[in-house]
Amino acid sequence: MSRLGALGGARAGLGLLLGTAAGLGFLCLLYSQRWKRTQRHGRSQSLPNSLDYTQTSDPGRHVMLLRAVPGGAGDASVLPSLPREGQEKVLDRLDFVLTSLVALRREVEELRSSLRGLAGEIVGEVRCHMEENQRVARRRRFPFVRERSDSTGSSSVYFTASSGATFTDAESEGGYTTANAESDNERDSDKESEDGEDEVSCETVKMGRKDSLDLEEEAASGASSALEAGGSSGLEDVLPLLQQADELHRGDEQGKREGFQLLLNNKLVYGSRQDFLWRLARAYSDMCELTEEVSEKKSYALDGKEEAEAALEKGDESADCHLWYAVLCGQLAEHESIQRRIQSGFSFKEHVDKAIALQPENPMAHFLLGRWCYQVSHLSWLEKKTATALLESPLSATVEDALQSFLKAEELQPGFSKAGRVYISKCYRELGKNSEARWWMKLALELPDVTKEDLAIQKDLEELEVILRD
């Protein structure tokens, strides 16, 4: 039972419980008056038989005959004898009341356990956030110079996620360390001994960066004169590089890796250009999709988001900057705590809207907006209220909103995404339009799997085939 169902059932059950209690109280009052009167007349021995069981015409069914005890006229007026059919109706209602009370008790227990679990989760999130703030404060209070360790075999600083048998929110928020974290623990073991288990270095992160940074050091002397002369090179110098990066981005997995390495090698020369920075952020997003290691995925998403932020600092009028910043927010949110995931969701929507406002003919922006609306429309009532309480902003979207965005992306570029067509089919099915859903399902089957999202949504497509089968 979902939390929303638990809340609704609890409210309905509470009303039923109050009505039942009032009825039982009235019956108890009548029973008490009858008992007192029989005591006065010296007929207390007949009271246990005032309500008795008797066999009905239905085999196997017993009903309780509500017959009046012989007495004065007042007794007969208080509890008149009921016909057998009336007694059966009363018993059926009492059975229904008892069943409802049992169901209500079960729902209350489930609601209590779910609320207890939610409270514990929120407390854990707050505690982890406070502990992380304390760690950052301690590190800022005791700055020191890092000593490089020969065991790492690299001069670059890599951010990795903590590894272990369990992966908690505390680790996802603050379990970062560098490849040389061992030397940090040796210098500050007394102050940060409790963080030692969380800071496990990852020795297999982004091996390609080592060579790229070595090349940067070799090219530093040649690029310094250009930087001192006036910053970045002109457009005629960087344009071939940008075109090559765009071509590699549209290629296969190997092409994306080469494009990332190409941009990383030229960051020292062209890193002050906005059109270079958002392409570098896009390359980080590609690498985040390609890698399978969780720590590497988080590191790529984090570094890419920083590059996108640097690009936005140079101007707010680039649709590509907003678009790839939103994409990296979504990728990084997969490795963050609940509160930060909610914040990333709002940032995602904000920057996608800006990208659409600046470049309304971009099909990717409309596809991302449709996916956001679809996910929000399927949040539970409790999840929406939690998000609204955390950020003091309403969170609402419908399946119809998602459908319009997906259709807009398909209109701008037919066959833009296989996943987009699957989402269109799912939206039509949820809106009760099965014929349209079948049509878009067939169109989705015509497209090849291009992205990992296309592969991941293949299961949904197979389920649609079964549901929409003629």
UniProtKB/Swiss-Prot annotation:
Q: Low complexity compositional bias: what residue ranges?
A: 220-231
Q: What are the UniProt keywords, alphabetically? A: Apoptosis, Coiled coil, Cytoplasm, Cytoskeleton, Differentiation, Membrane, Microtubule, Mitochondrion, Mitochondrion outer membrane, Nucleus, Phosphoprotein, Transmembrane, Transmembrane helix
Q: Where is this motif: FFAT?
A: 157-163
Location of Phosphoserine modifications: 44, 46, 50, 57, 183, 193, 212, 232
Localization of this protein: Mitochondrion outer membrane; Cytoplasm; Nucleus; Cytoplasm, Cytoskeleton, Spindle
Q: What induces it?
A: By EGF, TGFB1, retinoic acid- and 1,25-dihydroxyvitamin D(3).
Q: Where is the composition biased (Acidic residues)?
A: 191-201
**Which GO-annotated molecular functions does the record name?**
microtubule binding
Q: Which residues form the signal peptide?
A: none
One GO biological-process annotation of the entry reads: cell differentiation
Could you say which protein family the record assigns here?
Belongs to the RMDN family.
Q: What protein am I looking at?
A: Regulator of microtubule dynamics protein 3
- Which organism does this record belong to? Homo sapiens (Human)
**Organism lineage string:** Eukaryota, Metazoa, Chordata, Craniata, Vertebrata
